[in-house]
Amino acid sequence: MEGAGGENEKKKMSSERRKEKSRDAARSRRSKESEVFYELAHQLPLPHNVSSHLDKASVMRLTISYLRVRKLLDAGDLDIEDEMKAQMNCFYLKAPDGFVMVLTDDGDMIYISDNVNKYMGLTQFELTGHSVFDFTHPCDHEEMREMLTHRNGPVRKGKEQNTQRSFFLRMKCTLTSRGRTMNIKSATWKVLHCTGHIHVYDTSSNQPQCGYKKPPMTCLVLICEPIPHPSNIEIPLDSKTFLSRHSLDMKFSYCDERITELMGYEPEELLGRSIYEYYHALDSDHLTKTHHDMFTKGQVTTGQYRMLAKRGGYVWVETQATVIYNTKDSQPQCIVCVNYVVSGIIQHDLIFSLQQTESVLKPVESSDMKMTQLFTKVESEDTSCLFDKLKKEPDALTLLAPAAGDTIISLDFGSDDTETEDQQLEDVPLYNDVMFPSSNEKLNINLAMSPLPASETPKPLRSSADPALNQEVALKLESSPESLGLSFTMPQIQDQPASPSDGSTRQSSPEPNSPSEYCFDVDSDMVNVFKLELVEKLFAEDTEAKNPFSAQDTDLDLEMLAPYIPMDDDFQLRSFDQLSPLESNSPSPPSVSTVTGFQQTQLQKPTITVTAATATTATTTDESKAVTKDNIEDIKILIASPPSTQVPQEMTTAKASAYSGTHSRTASPDRAGKRVIEKTDKAHPRSLNLSVTLNQRNTVPEEELNPRTIALQNAQRKRKMEHDGSLFQAAGIGTLLQQPGDRAPTMSLSWKRVKGYISSEQDGMEQKTIFLIPSDLACRLLGQSMDESGLPQLTSYDCEVNAPIQGSRNLLQGEELLRALDQVN
């Protein structure tokens, strides 16, 4: 028994020794293996901090990849690098917007550049030696294998095998939108545009002596560029880049306006049209496949293709397209494209599609287009030129037909009548400071601010209800030794203490010097003020065509006729002297005189002063003072004066008034008590400081106006309104045929724009004074004979009138007015 026990102990001891020796041997082998891997890791072209932390599998993986790369490099004919090439090596990876990857025929990544971490978040040593199929989308594996396959079969004579590769690959990315890295298990897919070629390396020169011939080594060299998302583009787009958005059928839903400069298209004309209509036919197959990849993988880059320009030819474009998905149901919503135009228009004289012929073929001009061009041209034209155009296109005049309810004026363009009217127009000196620019000053007048629509065609101020009015218009257009002054004054909110002005000063106020003082400019805002019903009421006329310059033989006194009150409901017939007790309830300060009752309700808004009389202090008589060059220069100085200077404007009070002395049966009401109110707009220091003469109220608020006085005033206002309106209106109709280019609409509408100007500019915050330079025709008017009785002398009091608000309900009409006039006389 003892012997058997001793043998068992010996066996145990021997087995333990063997196990210990085995462990020691394994430990020794592992240590030697570790030393080998350590030495091998340090032979790799990797930083020490990276190679020292590699496991054995990684060392073997990287070593194999390194040997394969060396094999590729040895197989190629490499030149010895000089110092210049060695310095340029560091810039090669910065040129492409991506990283370099080399794959074997079985998909192993034997090389990948170190800047892959910048785009994918994965490091170089984590990818090198691994299979590309471990990091790509499963749906792309089949396409990836096709790209790696190189067919070595026979090739047709004269045709080389295509080794170029371009495809889109979805690869794992551990980068977040904020630039942080995540775990590989949580990685997302990023679309890479991979371009490169297949390289076949023949290694037969380095084969061993045994005679065994190794097969050539096939590698796929790629440059992988990630496609940026449109929402993450950090670099601002240059002028050669435009954005576009498309629906899922590739129709435009938005396009950047920069496409107009680059290709000639307007963004509006592209909306709703397919992008395929603008592709070159030779690139349609390539782009169709690209769009298929876009819907499959989410992003694509088209590469350079040809896109047709609008007026012929094409440009080279490269597009980055991204499918935008709905955040709720993850369904595709639209496509956003970033289009880079890489060339100018090539072969611009060639037509490639029907869309390009739209800009080449001359469109058929319709009568609408011709008439629009004819009556909206700003250049000046001769009368004969206009006559020839209208003679060739007589049917085009139907476009100027008035709206329903308007009066139709027949236009006769016969040669005899035209010559007769031209002769009459030459004999009539017209006020052309607003309607016509002076030939000496070359004033520029914008035609776009004056014309009215076709339904508001200007009409002569004539009335069948008052035939004597037509004679009065013609008589007042005759030459006159007297000149007229016209002033329309509107109050302003800010009040300043009134400066005293004695009666002698007002009596020495000079007469208006020239007819140009009747003419005044208006702003382009007046076009928006007119209404059709107001124009129809103001310019009611007879249906039969009459000569506006014809005069009747019988001399009728307008004061004995019923007053013609325009049915314009915008203003009241009020002046500074006759203010009713109702004005005492106005919210305006008592120191500010108002023009009309309508203006009193708008005193919270600053208004405008339009003054046509030039400022002067010289005492004049009834004899008119001719306009000289000195007067014109004085007016120019007033216009060019700096805004900070004070320009006093004194309203004239002519002694030889049209309604005083022998010119009228009733003298003008006493206007003693005028005072000059210095208006200084402190809120606008650059505005002119105007000194405007206003009439002081002498009426007691409790007393009522005498009906006789009202009737007399209405008759006077009616005469003045018809006289002033006839001047502008008759001149406008006559000159429409004389110079139709750019002045007739402005001239014929001047009187209407005066009334609208006061009401439309009440919303402005500044007070303006507009001076007009007298023109050559105004000088002709002053140079006429002084033998005949001509234009009556009107004062500022006579001109400060407007139309009533309540119409004729409170006014005397017909026989009642005649009886009131007889009692006054």
Curated annotation (Swiss-Prot):
- Location within or outside the cell: Cytoplasm; Nucleus; Nucleus speckle
Q: Basic and acidic residues compositional bias: what residue ranges? A: 7-30
Note down the stretches annotated as region Required for heterodimer formation with ARNT. 170-191
Residues modified as Phosphothreonine: T554
Keywords from the UniProt entry: Acetylation, Activator, Cytoplasm, DNA-binding, Hydroxylation, Isopeptide bond, Nucleus, Phosphoprotein, Repeat, S-nitrosylation, Transcription, Transcription regulation, Ubl conjugation
**What residues bear 4-hydroxyproline in this entry?**
P402, P563
Question: Which domain of life does this protein belong to?
Answer: Eukaryota
Q: Where is this motif: Nuclear localization signal?
A: 717-721
Residues in cross-link Glycyl lysine isopeptide (Lys-Gly) (interchain with G-Cter in ubiquitin): K531, K537, K546
| Activity regulation remarks | Induced by reactive oxygen species (ROS).
Q: Where is this region: NTAD?
A: 530-574
DNA-binding, as annotated region: 21-30
Q: For the region Disordered, give the residue spans.
A: 1-30, 492-520, 579-602, 654-674
Q: Where is the PAS domain?
A: 85-158, 228-298
Q: Which residues form the bHLH domain?
A: 17-70
Q: What are the start and end residues of every segment in region (ID)?
A: 575-784
**Per its UniProt record, what InterPro entries does this chain match?**
bHLH_dom, HIF-1_alpha, HIF-1_CTAD, HIF_alpha-like, HLH_DNA-bd_sf, PAC, PAS, PAS-like_dom_sf
According to the UniProt record, list the residues that bear S-nitrosocysteine. C799
Free-text comment about domains: Contains two independent C-terminal transactivation domains, NTAD and CTAD, which function synergistically. Their transcriptional activity is repressed by an intervening inhibitory domain (ID).
Q: What name is this protein filed under?
A: Hypoxia-inducible factor 1-alpha
